[in-house]
Amino acid sequence: MITLITAVPGSGKTLYAIGLIEAALSEGRPVFTNISGLVKDKFSNPHLLSDAPDDWRDTPEGSLVVYDEAQQAHLYPSNAQRGPVTDERLTAMETHRHTGHDLVFITQAPTFVHHHIRKLVGLHIHLYRSRGLQAASKYEWSHVCDSPNDRKEQQRADFVLWKFPKEHFAFYTSAVMHTHKFKMPKKIGVLLVFVVLGLGAVGFNLYKNSGLASMAEATASVAEATPSPLALNGVKPSSLAAPYQWSAAAPAVPVSGCVANRSTNRCQCFDASGVVLAIEHAACLSVISSPLPRQLLSTSK
């Protein structure tokens, strides 16, 4: 199969190819590649890993050949020449399956490589890495997609979020892959600020309401524990709501007049009907000695 891998620098193209190379070496297949900075000792069967020649036909049958920066002039760059293709390396790709070869071309954009290769591609993989994440959106087509960043084309593709396999970082050196740091989008940052403020407001209200409830409970407890003055005097608080107050004491009667006999040391007071009233001796004398009329309440005998 002919596979095309496209993405801008730092998106994980080489890292993805490392996975293909390691899988092929694990199966015992010979692999040829021009990827620079490979640490061969990290791979399985490193003796099967060799540098790729400019002509893929110079590799044994059943080989996996991976060309990085395939648009380079000595490899398979795009050109505007019309008419029959004269490069035998390109025309031989039409029957590459007869020799069991798998060819992988890595570049930034599909239009960078020769149009004859684009016509023969059976798998196009496009990677898009956003804001320095340790992952990339992977889009796959069974043919070349000339506009892999077009939303409509991406909807037609098979999509998966591909997490960078950290175990493969040690297989090669990349000055771009490991220097990208995650940058949070401004919209997400503003949204997080509002979420934090909202959660803080909710928490404060809950704390405030719980504090008021605790104060109310404490006040109610103190009120229940402290007897009212009326209760101390033997009067129930519920009696305050009654429309009338009843008392066992005798009704008070106005004093109309008093008479004193000094020889017998007696003093009596009467109401308007002449009934003798029960009144203290001193109070009776006080009524006589003070000018009348005045009202003095007493109880009848």
From Swiss-Prot:
<keyword id="KW-1133">Transmembrane helix</keyword>
<dbReference type="GO" id="GO:0033644">
    <property type="term" value="C:host cell membrane"/>
</dbReference>
<keyword id="KW-1043">Host membrane</keyword>
<feature type="binding site">
    <location>
        <begin position="7"/>
        <end position="14"/>
    </location>
    <ligand>
        <name>ATP</name>
    </ligand>
</feature>
<keyword id="KW-0067">ATP-binding</keyword>
<keyword id="KW-0547">Nucleotide-binding</keyword>
<keyword id="KW-0472">Membrane</keyword>
<dbReference type="GO" id="GO:0005524">
    <property type="term" value="F:ATP binding"/>
</dbReference>
<dbReference type="InterPro" id="IPR008900">
    <property type="entry name" value="Zot_N"/>
</dbReference>
<dbReference type="GO" id="GO:0016020">
    <property type="term" value="C:membrane"/>
</dbReference>
<dbReference type="InterPro" id="IPR027417">
    <property type="entry name" value="P-loop_NTPase"/>
</dbReference>
<comment type="function">
    <text>May play a role in phage assembly.</text>
</comment>
<dbReference type="Pfam" id="PF05707">
    <property type="entry name" value="Zot"/>
</dbReference>
<feature type="transmembrane region" description="Helical">
    <location>
        <begin position="187"/>
        <end position="207"/>
    </location>
</feature>
<keyword id="KW-0812">Transmembrane</keyword>
<protein>
    <recommendedName>
        <fullName>Putative assembly protein ORF301</fullName>
    </recommendedName>
</protein>
